[in-house]
Amino acid sequence: MTAANARLLTTLLSLAEDTGSLSDELHFAGRDATERDPLDHGAANVLRALVLPKAPRVLEVGAGFGGLTRYLGEVAATVHAVEADPVRAAAVRFRTRGLGTVTVHDKLVVETYDLVVVQQPYATRNLLDWVRERLSPTGAVVVLTASRGVAGTLAAAGLEVQRELLCSPGHEVARAVRGARIDTELPRLSAAIAGGPANGLALLCGPGAAALWPPYRLATYFNTAERAAFACTRADVVRTGEGAEVRRVPLVPSPPVAGISVGPCADKVYDAPTMVEVLLDEPERVAELLTGWRDLVREEAARGVEALWDLVPHNVLVDGATLRPIDLEWRNAGAGVSEVVERGVLVLADKLADAGWPAAADGGSMRDLAGWLGVLIGLHPSFVDGALEREVAFSTIGSCGTEHGTDEVRGSIAEIWRKRLARTVHEYRSTKAGAGVAANEDEVAKR
């Protein structure tokens, strides 16, 4: 990072009204990855994924711009953040202002610590020897790194790695944190939540390392990217007596915004493809699966399922002859069966068009595809316009966390949708699965 970027980030932090670890103000302030990563909702996800000691005394070595420091200050009794660079140290002070738990230093402070967090560049033998001597009897060390090379230095300092966690895409802004066992036990789910290579590691050391990551937990992943804080969630993949389960919860309890909210949900893990994946491989099943999904929506509504809004085809597993809903976290108080069915068809058309679905008509647009899919289950093709309007409104709320002052964002999302509806399916194929899908609640309002 250049000195100019560092000064800009420090200035942004000095001017921000909300410097919390889930600050929307900061999350959406960065212009590029260099600026965004230190301000991201997910900057502290690697620590959110851990079971930290209750009211710990924490030492952080290499505080950077305070993304981890802020979170630690919100959950710990005492945090000593060490940052030698004066510009970054100032940034940490701005990020943690108002927290009586945090003090920022330019050198190590001699105390006893329950948790020590070390960034890789500082993980030298001398530092690690010093840290080992100042760990409490149940203390733990977390080293954040992009390389396993530091493991030898840790071992030489008497801090053998007790557990290695993979961070995707990296530890700086981790969307998924997982142990290696999930790759062999649940390979389909592991690939889905990782979304690509793991370029970061969290190495857990010390006598208290095992408690940071319980043996029953396989992975933790987050939806914090393009959502307002009220809609950010975490999901823990845990072993159960019957296999494994995904348990989702909001990161912060929040009231609905214009009837939109997220809530907890739990799903048993099945080794089965989603409805979208099946349709990409077996397009001839489209009428069968669409009809089955529509009937499933009706059945779940009759059972009083609260999160009906999320019951769309990419959240349905095809487990043999059984359709199984998963990941039902979004609630929309204004939506009933017809609105959910129309939404599901619209979003399905977008995902199939994104993949250049071979069963789409030659020369046809995504709008044409959505209309045709709708006809298969009794919808008039004109449903697209109403479904689009609702999806834009939903995406705007999910991204902004408010219904006020959002005209610019709403207009941008609507324009993205108009362009996608107009594109010719067979002339378009994303270079990345799911890239740019404005309907996906994790990718709304790219701005």
PLM regions with names:
Residues 1-19:
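N-terminal auxiliary segments of SAM/dcSAM-dependent transferases
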Residues 37-56:
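Conserved alpha-helix/loop element of class I SAM-dependent methyltransferases that forms part
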Residues 55-64:
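Conserved class I S-adenosyl-L-methionine
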Residues 65-76:
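Conserved SAM-binding loop of SAM-dependent methyltransferases across substrates and taxa
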Residues 75-101:
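Class I SAM-dependent methyltransferase SAM/SAH-binding core
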Residues 126-137:
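A short glycine-rich, Lys/Arg-flanked "PGG" loop and its adjoining helix->strand segment in the class I
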Residues 167-243:
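Rossmann-like AdoMet/SAM-dependent catalytic core
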Residues 303-358:
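Catalytic activation segment of kinase domains across protein kinase-like and atypical kinase folds
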